[in-house]
Regions:
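Carbohydrate-active catalytic/glycan-binding domains of CAZyme proteins
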Residues: 1-499
Length: 499
């Protein structure tokens, strides 16, 4: 849950996070205790319907898409703003109901990197940038940029950094403007810094608010916002890089001292945090799913890798199963209709039942550990025969494949994700009615890489792929499928539970 931004309505807190190229995107989470969160809506079903988001012609939005959304309540309406670098646009979405998916969209043909809404003396602005921080005035109704409005550099932050200030979150308190940023000095960990001024003209004062990695060298807790409870207590929600599992939110107490926010225990991470709220019975952000649904609607824990082809998946065509029709792909990262959800620390076990009876020549279906260096376990059809196939992408970009014959129509697949002590290993298994669990291939060394820029997810996939030069087994001849053949894989009883 990276890049958090929060607001409070009465005694309910709402948080937005970044999901980049996963669809639907920009989840809105709800809580009453700041600790237990549940997904209640998504800002958009699709950012755009183009080649990039359909994974066509070698194009994709990996590492791009929706970034660092700012969330605000303004004049009885909710607003969200984020940039898409792949399209060179900034989007402002709005709604009357924050718990309803599919907000109204406004496009701005300009990039405002890591922006934050700012409402200062009756006017709305965007504050944005990396290192050099700019400010641009919006129209009164936030429908676009104000013609001849303020549009200038607001301040320039130190340049002798591994990462200069970015990830802005702006707030106003007692006549002062506060700008929160993440930065990364060359000789330390990522940290949270604050600039303040009582005028847009400055001068701006600066203070480091949090510089603590919690024992994970270099992985300082930073980038996020402050929120005030209904009782007047303050809290900070930042995030931390946790290796292969991705980025997780970090909650801590905050207070105000001499006009500055003080985070945690005087700028250090607290070991414990007592919250003065009744525990909120939230639905988990990861969940098992029987796939027994009366309509073609996903549980909110699920997201597709890029835009799905809605004609190629169904719960209702084979009741009790998730049916995925195979589309052509060169591999996992070009395959459409891969259905994903988050994994969880310190580790989790994911299982699913796969029916292969309607798969066709060249089809490959199963479970995956999805990131740039991915791993797969599933069933491949080759020369009319079935093989249990494990695939792993290596550090140098190659593929390691392990296969063995399969006779049954139904198979159970499993991936264990182990993040304990940053071991970051995924292990792949299968079993049939006649066999016990059997590991296939070596454990995958999971690595958070910047090509996808997200933590590992569990994924359910099915696509049609040519063998190419690396065949599953030497006897495979890459036989062509019959024209018009459409293979289907069916999945049921997906489970996810702690290791």
């Amino acid at each position: 849950m990276p890049d958090p931004d929060l607001l409070r309505v009465g005694d309910v807190y709402y948080m937005v996070s970044t999901t980049m190229f996963y669809m639907p995107g920009a989840p809105i989470l709800r809580s009453k205790d700041l600790y237990h969160w549940e997904i209640v809506s998504y800002i958009f079903e699709r950012i755009e319907d183009n080649e990039i988001y359909r994974l066509e012609n070698g194009k994709n939005a990996y590492g791009k898409g929706q970034w660092a959304t700012s969330l605000a309540a303004y004049r009885d309406r909710f607003y969200a703003c984020f940039v898409c670098h792949d399209m060179g646009k900034t989007f402002i979405y709005s709604t009357d109901d924050i718990e309803k998916s599919g907000w109204e969209k406004t496009e701005i043909n300009r990039v405002f990197h890591d922006m934050s809404f700012l409402f200062w003396k009756g006017k709305p602005y965007l504050v944005y940038g990396n290192g050099t921080i700019g400010i641009t005035e919006l129209k009164e109704d936030l429908s676009g940029l104000e013609e001849n409005g303020l549009d200038q550099t607001l301040l320039i932050t130190p340049s002798d950094m591994r990462l200069r200030c970015e990830g802005c979150r702006a707030l106003v308190k007692d006549g002062w403007l506060y700008l929160l940023f993440i930065e990364w000095p060359k000789d330390g960990c990522r940290r949270e810094v604050c600039y303040r001024a009582n005028s847009l003209e400055g001068p701006f004062e600066r203070k480091v608010l949090m510089e603590d990695d919690g024992g994970l060298p270099g992985r300082g807790v930073a980038q996020g916002t402050l929120v005030e409870s209904a009782a007047g207590e303050w809290y900070a929600v930042l995030f931390q890089d946790r290796g292969a599992s991705g980025r997780i939110p970090y909650l801590m107490q905050a207070r105000w001292e001499d006009g500055w926010p003080v985070l945690g225990e005087n700028g250090r991470l607290p070991e414990h945090l007592a919250l003065p709220f009744e525990p909120y019975p939230a639905q988990p952000v990861v969940s098992s799913d029987s796939f027994c649904h009366d309509e073609n609607r996903l549980m909110k824990v699920w997201q597709w890798n890029h835009n799905p082809d809605d004609a190629c998946w169904s719960f209702t065509s084979h009741p009790g199963w998730l049916s995925l029709e195979a589309k052509d792909a060169s591999g996992l990262l070009t395959a459409r209709n891969t259905l994903t959800q988050r994994t969880m620390e310190p580790g989790c076990r994911c299982e699913v039942i796969l029916s292969v009876s309607e798969m066709r020549e060249g089809d490959y279906a199963g479970l995956c550990a999805l990131q740039g260096r991915y791993g797969q376990i599933g069933v491949k059809i080759c020369d009319g025969k079935r093989y249990v196939l494990a695939v792993q992408k290596t550090r140098d970009g190659g593929l390691v494949k392990t296969a063995e014959p399969l006779e049954e129509d139904t198979i159970q697949l499993r991936i264990d994700f182990d993040y304990r002590n940053q071991i970051d290993l995924a292990t792949f298994y299968f079993r049939t009615k006649e066999t016990e669990w059997k590991q296939v291939g070596e454990a995958l060394e999971m690595v958070f890489t910047l090509d996808l820029f997200v933590g590992y997810r569990i994924g359910i996939f099915h696509y049609h792929e040519k063998m190419g030069e690396e065949k599953v087994v030497p006897e495979c001849t890459d036989r062509k499928r019959e024209p018009g053949q459409k293979g289907r894989a069916a999945f049921r009883n997906f489970t996810i539970r702690p290791l």
